[in-house]
């Protein structure tokens, strides 16, 4: 048994003049995840950073990116939120519009984690049971 989400959800907040916009989407394949990430980046071309994480295959495949933020301050906290909520087959992208104030490593980690958590809270979560397709002849 694992958890995923029904559909796209979004949440946002402002931290010291930087706007953080988090979007979470269900994805079935790595190609779906990359397509979702690229679409969010295209929507937010003027953003300073579009950091992401995704988990597929019941947690067997995960990827993340800090997209130019200091190492370990963005993608990893987003991935932690996905894993702590027991989610799979989801991708989260957190877009940051820089407000001119540096947040520091701790501030960035908290901000990206908060944004990702808010997106998960905004999503409708469902429980799924892995199944195999059988053909009867």
Model-derived features: positions:
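Short flexible coil/turn linkers enriched for glycine and charged/polar residues
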Residues: 18, 47, 86-88, 128-130
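C-terminal regulatory domains involved in ligand/effector binding and gene-expression control
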Residues: 1-73
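Conserved structured catalytic cores and adjacent interaction surfaces
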Residues: 107-109
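Short, flexible, solvent-exposed loop/turn segments with mixed acidic/basic and small polar residues
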Residues: 11-15, 122-127
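Structural motif
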Residues: 23, 51-52, 89-92, 135
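Ordered, amphipathic secondary-structure segments that act as subunit-interaction surfaces
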Residues: 69-105
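Short glycine-/aliphatic-rich beta-strand segments at the starts of folded cytosolic domains
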Residues: 126-137
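Stable alpha-helical structural segments in soluble proteins, enriched in small hydrophobic residues
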Residues: 111, 115-123
């Amino acid at each position: 048994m694992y958890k995923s989400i029904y559909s796209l959800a979004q949440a946002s907040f402002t931290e010291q003049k930087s706007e953080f916009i988090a979007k979470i989407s269900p994805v079935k394949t790595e190609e779906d995840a990359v397509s979702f990430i690229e679409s969010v980046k295209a929507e937010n071309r003027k953003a300073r950073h579009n950091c992401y994480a995704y988990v597929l295959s019941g947690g067997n495949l995960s990827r993340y990116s800090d997209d130019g933020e200091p190492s370990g301050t963005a993608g990893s906290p987003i991935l932690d939120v996905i894993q702590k909520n027991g989610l799979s087959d989801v991708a989260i992208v957190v877009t940051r519009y820089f407000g001119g104030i540096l947040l520091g490593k701790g501030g960035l980690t908290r901000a990206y984690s908060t944004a990702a958590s808010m997106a998960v809270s905004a999503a409708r979560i469902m429980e799924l049971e892995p199944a195999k397709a059988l053909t009867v002849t």
